[in-house]
């Protein structure tokens, strides 16, 4: 029972780690997004200005000590600020989960992986690898637009403040749907790399 709990807490750690890496890597690849997505033509601001405002937003979302969101070049509505506050809480929840489950992951590596007991969890790992693939295929079939909408409807039940009006919250113009598509693809690659590696390792004799 204790071993199973350690395993699933470790899987939760890897899941949260995949999310956090995606979030923090956004700081690195966003300058490329500005160029690839021609964001300067959407808001008529210099790339440096767009990036500066993005950094302010990301710092607010990821830093628990940052409590006020005020982007110098983008006004925000009450609904927009509410949505970002909700997202901030979700990000902090993921950070907390990663910290709480980190010790379990350490025990998992030392007590299960290194001692050769990973094969006992092969079926569980396979399920964790296949499930996101099936979800991804579903997303491809219905189109990312529909998938993105469904994702928000599930994550923010009864809250439609994620539906930004560019006239009231122009920051959405520098956060186009394609940017989130790239973030989803990055998360998928990280997630499948972690869990795929463990599954393949569990199958080795």
Can you describe what each PLM-predicted range is?
Residues 1-31:
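Hydrophobic secretory-pathway targeting helix
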Residues 11-18, 95-113, 182-205:
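Transmembrane alpha-helical segments in integral membrane proteins
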Residues 19-86, 159:
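Long, glycine/tryptophan/cysteine-rich extracytoplasmic
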Residues 62-100, 177-188:
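Individual transmembrane alpha-helix segments
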Residues 102-146, 197-205:
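Juxtamembrane interface at the cytosolic side of transmembrane helices
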Residues 141-166:
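Juxtamembrane non-transmembrane "cap" segments at the membrane-aqueous interface
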Residues 162-177:
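Solvent-exposed, non-transmembrane helices and loops of integral membrane proteins
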């Amino acid at each position: 029972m204790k071993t199973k709990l350690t395993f699933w807490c470790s899987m939760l750690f890897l899941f949260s780690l995949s999310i956090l890496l995606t979030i923090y890597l956004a700081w690195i690849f966003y300058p490329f997004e500005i160029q690839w997505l021609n964001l300067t033509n959407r808001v008529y601001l210099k790339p440096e200005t767009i990036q500066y405002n993005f950094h302010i937003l990301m710092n607010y979302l990821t830093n628990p000590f940052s409590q006020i969101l005020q982007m110098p070049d983008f006004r925000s509505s009450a609904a927009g600020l509410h949505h970002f506050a909700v997202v901030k809480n979700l990000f902090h929840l993921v950070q907390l989960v990663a910290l709480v489950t980190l010790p379990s992951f350490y025990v998992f590596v030392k007590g299960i992986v290194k001692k050769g007991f990973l094969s006992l969890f092969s079926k569980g790992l396979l399920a964790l690898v296949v499930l996101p693939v099936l979800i991804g295929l579903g997303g491809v079939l219905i189109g990312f637009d529909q998938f993105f909408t469904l994702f928000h409807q599930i994550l923010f039940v009864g809250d439609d403040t994620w539906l930004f009006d560019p006239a009231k919250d122009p920051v959405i113009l520098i956060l186009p749907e394609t940017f989130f598509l790239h973030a989803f693809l990055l998360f998928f690659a990280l997630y499948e790399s972690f869990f795929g590696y463990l599954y393949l390792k569990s199958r080795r004799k």
